[in-house]
Design a protein with these regions (language model features):
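C-terminal output/effector regions of signal-responsive regulators
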Residues: 145-363
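Alpha4 helix (beta4-alpha4-beta5 surface) of REC/receiver domains from two-component response regulators
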Residues: 76-91, 97-163
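Conserved phosphotransfer microenvironments
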Residues: 39-91, 101-109
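Conserved acidic segment of CheY-like receiver
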Residues: 1-33, 67
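Beta-sheet entry/capping signal
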Residues: 3, 95-96
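Short, solvent-exposed polar/charged micro-motifs at secondary-structure junctions
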Residues: 39-42, 136-142, 176
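Short, flexible coil/linker elements and helix-boundary hinge sites characteristic
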Residues: 21-25, 56-63, 93, 180, ...
Length: 363
């Protein structure tokens, strides 16, 4: 069973989300269920610290695995501010998913997600708007379950190897150990520039509020893995990025089961892999070697009509634009923006998109 505390001030939204969770392994716990609506802070201590104490007790009492936090809590006027909950939950080291309802779709659908992740990736996993208030709401419960399992897998790995939290182990070393292969830690060095943000140590007066050191570090490691490493393709690639790496149109994987079956040997099975298929770039390289450098021209798939992204240079690597989500060739890709981690070698933005965005492209 996965228990999710939803901090939302609109009762109809809570009821709707609970309806989606009916007959699943997930159950939503509302602010009313834990007495959060009646919580009244005193003037003797900061609101955030009082909330941290209150939430720590309730999370333990109800066995809460994950918190789902709305960014706008101003309508019901029965809860504290979003920023207060955000700060309190970060002091606890509790995994959080945040969301913002409403809004319209855009051709640059990935841009808001990128902006939020870069700005607040060290404090929450963002749920896309379409999943909380659009045409993909049926994806909410499975996504929350997968996210909760991801954090839990990291936490259990740290519990099983307590030495990882002692001594001079870097986040790259710990992540490699959690993923079951200490030899791959170098793959994540290019993502270490933001480690001071993702792995900031709590101040002395705040440390007493954390649920546990293992929980705090598991949450930090989870944010870094999902929001930074898996968001910006490099050693771990999303399914579209994996197809592009092989210069194959992503839609071809659904058309040809033989093709998707061949890629399974390269599939990533670590934390958060249940959210969507991901693949190891190193395993894709081995796969290319097995298929003489090009899957499409290999004898096993010669009878299939497989569409390429770059039709002019079949041997080239292609990409998925970080902003539009569409396939692009190497010639269409702009120079890598400075907000992309140096380790994200497969992360590119369409040059035309970058020009159209103008100042927004600075994120």
């Amino acid at each position: 069973m996965c228990k999710v505390l939803i901090i939302e001030d609109q009762l109809d939204i809570i009821d709707r989300f609970k309806g989606f969770a009916a007959d699943t392994e997930l159950s939503f716990i509302s602010p009313t269920d834990i007495g959060l609506v009646g919580f009244s802070p005193t003037e003797d201590e900061a609101v955030e610290e009082q909330l941290a104490t209150f939430l720590k007790n309730k999370i333990g009492e109800h066995g809460i695995d994950l918190v789902l936090l709305d960014t706008d809590l101003s309508r019901g006027r029965t809860l504290q501010t979003h920023s207060s909950y955000k700060a309190a939950l970060r002091e606890l080291g509790m995994p959080v998913c945040r969301y913002q309802k409403g809004g319209t779709t855009s051709e640059f659908e990935q841009l808001p997600q990128l902006q939020r992740t870069i700005r607040d990736g060290a404090s929450a996993i963002w749920i896309p708007r379409a999943i909380v208030s659009g045409d993909r709401m049926h994806e909410l419960v499975p996504r929350l379950i997968a996210i909760s399992r991801g954090f839990k897998a990291i936490y259990e790995a740290l519990q099983a190897s307590p030495e990882l939290l002692k001594g001079r182990h870097s986040p790259t070393d710990v992540l490699a150990a959690v993923l079951g292969n200490s030899a791959i830690s170098y793959e994540f060095l290019g993502y270490a520039a933001q480690n001071l943000v993702y792995f900031a140590n709590p101040e002395a007066h705040v440390a007493e509020y954390q649920i546990s050191e293992e929980q705090r570090f598991a949450t930090q490691l989870g944010y870094w893995l999902f929001n930074y490493i898996m968001m910006f393709p490099g050693p771990i690639l999303s399914e579209p990025s994996a197809a592009a790496y092989l210069n194959i149109q992503p839609s071809e994987l659904k058309k040809h089961s033989e093709l998707s079956e061949a890629l399974k040997v390269a599939q990533y099975h670590g934390p958060f892999s249940e959210i969507a298929p991901y693949f190891w770039r190193s395993a894709l390289i081995e796969l290319l070697n097995d298929f003489d450098g090009d899957i499409v021209r290999n004898e096993a798939f010669r009878d299939l009509e497989i569409a390429r992204i770059d039709t002019q240079s079949p041997d080239s690597v292609a990409y998925i634009c970080l902003v539009s989500g569409k396939p692009i060739t190497e010639q269409q890709a702009a120079p890598t923006p400075d907000w992309v981690p140096s380790g994200a070698s497969e992360a590119r933005v369409d040059d035309d998109v970058l020009s159209e965005l103008g100042p927004l492209a600075g994120i």
